[in-house]
């Protein structure tokens, strides 16, 4: 009985639900295409297929007869009859059509009777038999969607363009409509059909004209979306159309329907077509297409008088025709109001959209200018919305918080993530078994890298990941236990099984996988570095970052199981905070990166757990570490807090940035750098903070430069950009000026739409930037994005912060953003408090002992420091960090000084371990990028796009070595190591586009796989000795051929069974897309002559290879490299580079490099022509000695450098290649000579050699004069002789000259005029003169003749080949004259340089004709490269050009001016007091040199020099130099503990420890004394009146009148007592009150002491305002000024009278005040209305609401009284009536 009653209730409810749905909306009845009592029969066909632009199509088709019976209004019965289904994968004439011979099979479980509820032509709901599976249900929904025709006003979007004439049945309107693909905006058009419709509907040709209805869906505006997505790149639009500048169209999706229907029914024909276009590799021109077409055509319409079809058992309701993932009905949470026009996709705006809110304010200026109208009781305020930032403003929650499936439980796998099709929610028992089989298979494949591309290792790894992702916690735990035993196995294959499984679990991204990783760490299955590498990958692989998971992850990162493990502790904390940023704080990634369309937002947007739990905990941890002065941990916590990217981190960092909590400059810089994550959200607050720090010139420059690096990420406003451009002119810090210039100029070149605002603002400021040139060592930021409309390779950013104590940067960073990246990807950053100190510390820890100095010097550095009270700067703690974000690993390795001590100990321990033998086995498999997008198409089947970049690193090595450190017995470091290496790196770029045929469980797809693999299987040996490095390499497996490099591209079409365990490439049904002809192919062997055979084999069908050079057109190397791995024209490509070990007779290669220098060589004779050498053996001491002797012949006290390189191929028949070069010159001889020997020694090919000699004579050099070199000719003759073969030789003779034309140009150049002006003031070596002197020693004309004998014809036509080369390169200024010939065997060359025009011209005359290349470009630094100037070398002059004279800086003590190392020039003539030129008493580890240089003038034109120097090797010297008197030489007195070895024209003292000259000095021909201390460590030139010193050491540590050598001119005002502003005070402060000092100088010194002030840093306030200004800004701000509030008057008289204007005192309340008018104001009573209004200015007086009198006055006014008030008045506007009317 109970069952009967229950059945009756259910039937009643069901019938009531159907009967209550009438075919009307809002009382208006709409016609239905379905007439009661009729039966409609349709022919149904459906096809869905995938295809590339060429090649086979893969898909499926469905056909059936569809019968609809209308039994009552709004209720239909329907049934599919004879349903059939077929699959195909073949080449088709039309890729969208079906094969003619397609074979169909019956389709089960779909021919059941089901019911449809309609409202007019709109489908309301469905009832299915429970025996109908969900996949079949979705197919039916796709068919039913095609028949939906709703021309009613239901859910029409209000729009003025909407129109529909029901009588004429024509119109166009937009409405929200639900079909199987989603509830989205649909554009209806209703129109007549062309007369030819009868051909289309021959069976109904006699019926009245039908109407054509078309529908087009806008997927950018949906209230309910059925989709799954994960990992979608930032800015990639796939739901709709990319309209914003920062968006790119990733997927193009469209659904179009066409219906032919009678005016009152029936529907004769309905077609729905869905198309999806996407490039398999995300971006590119050649898109893949998934095409879905549903076709329904009416066969007959009959009267239906039969009984209803009986129900096929129990029924299952479907509340809508949306695609379903389960039988469970998911609730939709959205308003379906017809007036709704908000778009879900519009709710999640990019941060850039709000980055310039003032721009939108400008557009709405008029509305702001309008006066606001409020009542007198209430003041309304308008507030601008905040810019997007953090959790509060990135983007709003969607108005459609729908869900399509339940979020997986912590113990459940992610079913929807696999195919977005219904999955049985139960473990498959075979999963564990299949996973183990695949593990064994791919672990075995990993041992044979040659076959890895063919066996498709990486694709199989992703199959393993899929299996793991489908496991529950229990099943995964069981599987793990069975594999964990292999972890400690000595078997390589078993060990690889564990590591691959470990990485598979990491990449699965499911909650059970996360739980399993936690278990591993807690149970110490993985620890420290191994665990760290697993944990750091989780932020990019976890697919469901719920609040529970994020808090659990964070707490786990702080648990004892993690915190006590090295490497894991910091990595886990950063991974947890990065996940919290992606999943919660950054609302854009929280929506677009994770599957929110499937499950809704995974955490509530306004959940405060980040502010209440996460951030306070990290802030407390940071505070504690700072109090304990633990820099290492502090860096980690700063990085973790920065990772969160929430605006509230500014409050956490504020005390440290404001200086309230004392920390080092390095940590403050670290804080500012870690604001970048917040800056990426374009947060206005952080942008303001960064700009404030930048503008504060009292901040340390590293902090300011770090702010610049981040402010460009936040996209500064136009005003900020213009201010920064102006700062490039006047900012006191050269580092700030340099980085601003480089950043603005590179930002102006950006092309990607996402950088539109940044690029435009930079372009507007570009021309405001300074023309000052900055050195490469200064701070800079370079940004490049290689972009075109269809190809987005990525962004390349390189930046660094310059150092004051080194040319090495304090911070160096490279960032590459890939096209699939959401965060900064592939980031490498090294940061130091001082790079120089860091390297010195490491070096000293191993090599350098502290020297002891026994002898006291007259003026040692220590004594001078005491005399002048010079105190070394208080050194900040030594801190450093290395940050790497690579292979999905975000790692921070931070160091303090104590850590460096442990590091040196670790290195020592590792060396000891290596001596006994060390083995390493490492395997890492990961997905560098992965993107998944799935949604249904018209047929009711899910479209699936998956992009992955799986990669593997496999490394096995054995290392054994021996190390010898310097000792008493051996002064040199020696090492000998042997290492066996098997290294494999492989990556696939795998994009797959298709759909899941849910009827046959067949996955039809097309795709492209790019494969790249490197394999290094070699045994290496290295030997290091004094001056010798020997490197040996041999095959690890000499009996096997090895594939060293593999590259291939495979476009394919496939049809696979769902959950197939076979890789697509190995499936027999897969078809490769091929073309008819190859574009390029190679099949060649190289290296036969060396018996080491390299085989290059391959081919390509891609047109990209027709012009391979086009891939190298970008400004940066990263883009050029990335372009090699991508194809614009996708086509089959396959290349291999192999080492054929079996065919190679050479079994090993030994490379030897030897370098040595010989000093004071005295050999009589002259350099003769080149002759053959007798000794051709590698590394021959005999040959080197012979060549040293020959090259030094005739050179007085020659210094000879020798380089000996050799390569020996060892085997059954050795093959040796040798290259030996020697170079001889002398500081006291003008001759320069060189020799070169190149030879081969082969048992099969015999011995061959080429010998060459070179000789030139340097021109006369004038080191300190610009005018003297111009008065004499500059000429340097040279000659060369080459000998080759039996009788072949080449002889070259020519000269370098300076022409009169160039001399005249130089004399008239502005630089020369500046120098002349300085020279008249007795200043010969200021900046302008230095540059002019260098240019005066540069030749501008080179002319030489080449005569040859027995030269091959191809070399004789050199001029012709050179001409053709330049012509090919695009130099249009080339010309040839084949009639002007030289005699046979001779060629003439002329080269003319025009340095000021930056061009050069080449003339070549040869026996084959004359060629001339005119006005070709030349580098600006050419004069320095070609200059003969000494004592600087050519490479130093070039380096100085690129570093602003900071590579080899100089200081000159001139006649009346001093030029400092940092290029400051100031007026100061020396007095007879000793002045400190340089003083450095370095106590830094690794830098134990002590230096003091003093200078004074006893007479006006005579300067005396004193030098004290102590080296780290324990050698010391004192030099006292006095000017020459009359014709006598300079008086040089040297006191040293080293031995003098020469004492005539070149005096030399020898350092026995370093085996090199300790001191050299000589007088040059121009009368200048040249001094060289410790082999160019310090160089000086002196002519009795002026003294110039060159050195690149002592940066930022030296003191004296030559400045700090920091590169900052502002530092050259610092004296021992502080900063002074006058140059005479600065120089006098470094004078000594010794030896008859000058009284005037001492007076200046005393004055400097009085006026000196100490520099101090003043830190920046972080968004801080005083209360008064804050209050004033609220009441007097721009909004109030532009939109003054207008108050509306009213009468409070309660007695109704005639409607006339009454006078009434008014009041209003504003904030905490009561304001009352001082006079009565016109008003109307409440029962009257104003006839007209006017604005009247009225005086008001305001007092606090707490004021008793004003509260009383307010009550009186409300009673209609008019009290009189007094006080300070202000004027306000009131809207008052002119007349009052009833």
Swiss-Prot record:
Heterotetramer of two heavy and two light chains. It comes from the Eukaryota. Residues 333-367, 379-406 are annotated as: Disordered. Precursor of the egg-yolk proteins that are sources of nutrients during embryonic development. Glycans are attached at residues 569, 587, 1357, 1463, 1596. This is Vitellogenin. The keyword Cytoplasm applies.
């Amino acid at each position: 009985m109970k069952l009967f009653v229950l059945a009756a209730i259910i039937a009643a409810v069901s019938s009531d639900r159907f009967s209550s749905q009438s075919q009307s909306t809002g009382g208006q009845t709409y016609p239905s295409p379905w007439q009661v009592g009729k039966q409609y029969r349709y022919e149904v066909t459906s096809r869905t297929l995938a295809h590339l632009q060429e090649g086979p199509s893969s898909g499926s088709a469905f056909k059936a007869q569809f019968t609809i019976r209308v039994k009552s209004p709004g209720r239909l019965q329907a049934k599919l009859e004879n349903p059939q289904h077929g699959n195909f994968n073949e080449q088709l004439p039309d890729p969208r059509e079906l094969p003619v011979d397609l074979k169909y099979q019956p389709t089960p479980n779909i021919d059941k009777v089901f019911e449809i509820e309609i409202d007019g032509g709109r489908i309301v709901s469905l009832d299915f038999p429970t025996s109908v599976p969900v996949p079949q249900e979705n197919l039916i929904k796709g068919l039913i969607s095609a028949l939906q025709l709703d021309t009613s006003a239901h859910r029409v979007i209000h729009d003025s363009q909407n129109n529909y004439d029901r009588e004429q049945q024509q119109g166009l309107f937009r409405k929200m409509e639900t079909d199987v693909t989603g509830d989205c905006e649909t554009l209806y058009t209703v129109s007549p059909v062309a007369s030819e419709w009868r051909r289309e509907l021959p069976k109904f040709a006699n019926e009245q004209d039908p109407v054509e209805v078309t529908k087009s869906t806008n997927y950018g505006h949906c209230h309910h979306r059925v989709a799954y997505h994960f990992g979608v790149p930032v800015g990639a639009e796939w739901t709709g159309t990319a309209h914003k500048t920062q968006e790119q169209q990733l997927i193009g999706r469209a659904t179009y329907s066409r219906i032919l229907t009678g005016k009152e029914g029936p529907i004769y024909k309905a077609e729905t077509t869905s198309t999806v276009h996407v490039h398999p590799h995300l971006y590119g021109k050649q898109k893949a297409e998934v095409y879905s077409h549903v076709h329904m055509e009416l066969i007959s319409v009959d009267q239906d008088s039969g009984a209803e079809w009986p129900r096929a058992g129990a029924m299952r309701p479907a509340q809508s025709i949306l695609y379903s993932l389960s039988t469970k009905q998911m609730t939709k949470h959205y308003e379906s109001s017809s007036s709704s026009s908000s778009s879900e996709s519009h709710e999640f705006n990019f941060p850039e959209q709000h980055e310039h809110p003032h721009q939108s304010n400008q557009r709405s200026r008029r509305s702001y200018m309008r006066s606001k109208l409020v009542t007198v009781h209430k003041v309304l305020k308008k507030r601008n919305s905040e810019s997007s930032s953090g959790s509060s403003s990135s983007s709003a929650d969607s108005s459609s918080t729908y869900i399509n499936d339940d979020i997986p439980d912590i113990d459940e796998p992610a079913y929807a993530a696999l195919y977005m099709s219904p999955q049985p929610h139960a473990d498959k028992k075979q999963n564990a078994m299949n996973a183990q089989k695949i593990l064994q298979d791919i672990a075995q494949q990993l041992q044979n890298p040659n076959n890895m591309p063919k066996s498709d290792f990486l694709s199989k790894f992703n199959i393993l990941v899929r299996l793991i992702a489908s496991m529950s916690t229990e099943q995964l735990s069981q599987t793990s236990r069975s594999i964990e035993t292999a972890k400690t196995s000595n078997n390589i294959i078993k060990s690889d099984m564990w590591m691959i499984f470990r990485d598979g679990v990491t990449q699965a991204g499911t909650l059970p996988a996360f739980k399993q990783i936690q278990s591993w760490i807690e149970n110490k299955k993985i620890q420290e570095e191994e665990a760290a590498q697993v944990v750091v990958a989780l932020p990019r692989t976890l697919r469901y970052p719920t609040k529970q998971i994020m808090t659990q992850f964070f707490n786990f990162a702080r648990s004892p199981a993690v915190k006590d493990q090295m490497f894991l502790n910091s990595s886990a904390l950063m991974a947890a905070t990065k996940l919290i940023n992606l999943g919660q704080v950054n609302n854009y990634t929280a929506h677009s990166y994770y599957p929110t369309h499937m499950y809704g937002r995974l955490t509530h947007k306004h959940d405060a757990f980040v502010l209440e739990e996460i951030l306070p905990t990290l802030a407390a941890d940071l505070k504690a570490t700072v109090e304990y002065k633990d820099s290492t941990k502090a860096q980690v916590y700063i990085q973790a807090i920065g990772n969160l990217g929430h605006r509230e981190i500014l409050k956490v960092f504020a005390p440290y940035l404001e200086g309230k909590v004392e920390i080092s400059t390095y940590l403050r810089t670290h804080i500012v750098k870690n604001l970048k994550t917040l800056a990426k959200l374009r947060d206005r607050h952080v942008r303001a903070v960064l700009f404030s720090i930048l503008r504060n010139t009292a901040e340390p420059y590293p902090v300011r430069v770090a702010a610049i690096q981040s402010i460009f990420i936040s996209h500064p406003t136009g005003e900020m950009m213009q201010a920064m451009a102006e700062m490039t002119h006047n900012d006191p810090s050269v580092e700030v000026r340099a980085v601003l210039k480089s950043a603005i100029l590179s930002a102006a070149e950006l092309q990607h739409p996402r950088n539109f605002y940044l690029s435009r603002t930079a372009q507007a400021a570009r021309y405001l930037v300074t023309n000052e040139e900055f050195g490469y060592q200064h701070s800079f930021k370079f940004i490049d994005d290689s972009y075109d409309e269809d190809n987005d390779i990525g962004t390349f950013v390189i930046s660094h912060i310059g150092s004051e104590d080194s040319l090495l940067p304090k911070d160096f960073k490279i960032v590459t953003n890939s096209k699939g990246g959401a965060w900064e990807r592939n980031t490498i950053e090294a940061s130091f408090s001082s790079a120089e100190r860091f390297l010195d510390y490491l070096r000293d820890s191993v090599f350098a002992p502290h020297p002891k100095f026994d002898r006291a010097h007259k003026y040692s550095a220590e004594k001078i420091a005491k005399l002048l009270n010079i105190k070394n700067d208080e050194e900040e703690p030594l801190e450093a960090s290395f940050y790497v974000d690579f292979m999905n690993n975000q790692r921070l390795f931070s160091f303090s000084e104590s850590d460096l001590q442990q590091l040196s100990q670790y290195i020592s321990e590792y060396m000891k371990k290596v001596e006994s033998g060390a083995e390493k086995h490492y395997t890492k498999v990961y997905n560098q990028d992965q993107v998944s997008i799935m949604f249904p198409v018209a047929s009711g089947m899910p479209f699936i796009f998956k992009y992955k970049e799986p990669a593997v690193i496999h490394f096995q090595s054995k290392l054994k070595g021996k190390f010898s450190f310097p000792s008493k017995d051996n002064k040199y470091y020696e090492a000998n190591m042997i290492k066996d290496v098997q290294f494999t790196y492989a990556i696939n770029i795998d994009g797959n586009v298709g759909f899941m045929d849910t009827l046959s469980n067949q996955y039809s797809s097309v795709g492209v796989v790019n494969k790249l693999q490197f394999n290094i299987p070699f045994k290496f040996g290295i030997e290091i000795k004094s001056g010798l490095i020997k490197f040996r390499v041999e095959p690890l497996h000499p009996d096997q051929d090895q594939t060293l490099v593999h590259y291939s591209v495979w476009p394919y079409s496939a049809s696979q069974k769902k959950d197939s365990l076979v890789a697509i490439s190995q499936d027999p049904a897969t078809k490769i897309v091929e073309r008819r002809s190859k574009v390029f192919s190679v099949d060649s062997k190289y290296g036969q002559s060396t018996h080491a055979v390299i085989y290059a084999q391959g081919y390509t069908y891609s047109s990209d290879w027709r012009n391979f050079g086009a891939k190298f057109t970008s400004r940066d190397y990263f883009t050029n490299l990335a372009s090699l791995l991508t194809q614009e024209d996708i086509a089959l490509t396959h290349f291999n580079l192999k080492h054929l070990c079996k065919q190679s007779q050479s079994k090993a290669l030994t490379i030897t490099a030897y370098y040595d220098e010989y000093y004071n060589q005295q050999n009589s004779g002259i350099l003769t022509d080149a002759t053959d050498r007798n000794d051709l053996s590698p590394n021959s001491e005999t040959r080197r000695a012979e060549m040293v002797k020959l090259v030094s012949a005739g050179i007085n006290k020659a210094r000879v450098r020798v380089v000996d390189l050799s390569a020996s191929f060892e085997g059954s028949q050795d093959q040796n290649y040798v290259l030996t070069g020697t170079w001889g010159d002398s500081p006291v001889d003008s001759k320069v000579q060189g020799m070169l020997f190149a030879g081969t020694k082969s048992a099969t090919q015999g011995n061959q050699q080429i010998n060459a000699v070179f000789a030139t004579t340097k021109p006369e050099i004038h080191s300190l004069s610009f005018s003297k070199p111009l008065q004499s000719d500059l000429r340097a003759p040279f000659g060369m002789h080459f000998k080759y073969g039996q009788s072949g030789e080449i002889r070259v003779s020519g000269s370098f000259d300076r022409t009169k034309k160039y001399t005249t140009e130089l004399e008239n150049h502005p630089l020369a005029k500046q120098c002349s002006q300085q020279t008249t003031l007795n200043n010969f070596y200021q900046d302008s003169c230095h540059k002019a002197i260098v240019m005066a020693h540069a030749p501008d004309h080179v002319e030489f003749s080449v005569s040859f004998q027995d030269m091959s014809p191809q070399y004789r036509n050199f001029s012709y080949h050179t001409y053709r080369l330049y012509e090919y390169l695009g130099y249009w200024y080339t010309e040839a004259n084949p009639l002007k010939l030289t005699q046979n065997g001779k060629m003439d060359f002329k080269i003319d340089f025009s340095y000021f025009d930056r061009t050069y011209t080449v003339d070549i005359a040869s026996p084959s004709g004359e060629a001339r290349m005119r006005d070709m470009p030349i580098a600006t630094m050419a004069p320095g490269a070609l200059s003969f100037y000494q004592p600087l070398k050519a490479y130093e002059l070039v380096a100085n050009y690129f570093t602003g004279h900071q590579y080899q800086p100089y200081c000159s003590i001139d006649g009346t001016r001093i030029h400092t190392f940092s290029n400051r020039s100031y007026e100061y003539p020396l007095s007879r007091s000793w002045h400190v030129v340089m003083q450095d008493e370095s106590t830094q580890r690794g830098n134990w040199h002590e230096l003091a240089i003093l200078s004074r003038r006893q007479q006006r034109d005579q300067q005396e020099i004193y030098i004290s120097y102590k080296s780290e090797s324990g050698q010391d010297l004192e030099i006292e130099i006095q000017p020459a008197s009359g014709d006598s030489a300079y008086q040089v007195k040297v006191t040293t503990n080293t031995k003098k070895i020469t004492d005539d024209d070149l005096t030399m003292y020898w350092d026995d420890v370093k085996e090199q000259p300790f001191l050299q000095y000589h007088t040059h021909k121009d009368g200048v004394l040249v001094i060289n201390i410790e082999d160019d460590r310090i160089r000086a030139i002196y002519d009795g009146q002026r003294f110039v010193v060159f050195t690149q050491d002592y940066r930022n540590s030296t003191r004296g009148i030559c400045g700090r050598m920091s590169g900052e001119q502002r530092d050259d005002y610092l004296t021992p007592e502080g900063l002074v502003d006058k140059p005479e005070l600065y120089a006098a402060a470094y004078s000594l009150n010794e030896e008859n000092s000058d009284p005037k100088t001492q007076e200046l010194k005393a004055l400097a002491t009085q006026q000196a002030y100490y520099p101090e840093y003043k830190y920046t306030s972080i968004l801080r305002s005083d209360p008064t200004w804050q209050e004033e800004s609220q009441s007097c701000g721009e909004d109030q000024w532009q939109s003054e509030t207008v108050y509306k008057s009213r009468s409070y008289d309660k007695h109704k009278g005639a409607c006339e204007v009454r006078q009434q005192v008014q009041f209003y309340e504003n904030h905490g005040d009561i304001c009352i008018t001082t006079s009565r104001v016109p008003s109307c009573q409440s029962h009257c209305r104003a006839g007209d209004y006017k604005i009247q200015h009225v005086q008001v007086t305001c007092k606090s609401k707490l004021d008793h009198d004003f509260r009383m006055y307010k009550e009186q006014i409300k009673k209609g009284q008019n009290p009189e008030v007094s006080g300070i008045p202000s004027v306000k506007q009131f809207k008052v009536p002119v007349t009052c009317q009833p």
